[in-house]
């Protein structure tokens, strides 16, 4: 499989993608971040999003992918379930895992329901809208991406501002009180 048309021009990463594809629970893999939008440079990492029926254990992922990495932290949860790695050739790769059913409910809630969440509502939307499908066994990711190809709804914009404004200042859990 040749991923070059998707701005993946790294043989080591192609092997990782093929290894991920071999897992039964993996339904789709997409390229996100600057590599998917054309804004990357020679220092850019790869952001790989793996959509699964069930997220493989960190141990399974380490056994499958560890041989391709010179440095790796499997099973991090800073933002989502993720593996933060540097490939054997020195290229940094973040691999983010999403459960299809759970993520599908989240997308429905945001896009169809207009519900805002703290901080990352627009980031998730941008990610889905601009990611490149590397493979999609079931059509799941393509469905998510197609849902995101609409104009940003006014009710969601208003909900994001209202929801996140309270985090900035004036409330007990606001950021301004936390950093004092």
Model-derived features with residue positions:
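Accessory alpha/beta interaction modules
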Residues: 26-27, 46, 75-80
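Short N-terminal helix-initiation segments at or just after the protein's N-terminus
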Residues: 26-40, 133-141
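A short alpha-helix capping/helix-coil boundary motif
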Residues: 16-17, 61-63, 154
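Helical scaffold of the NTase/Pol beta-like nucleotidyltransferase catalytic core
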Residues: 1-30
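Conserved NTP/Mg2+-binding pocket subregion across the NTase superfamily
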Residues: 2-5, 69-179
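Catalytic metal-binding acidic patch
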Residues: 32-67, 82-97
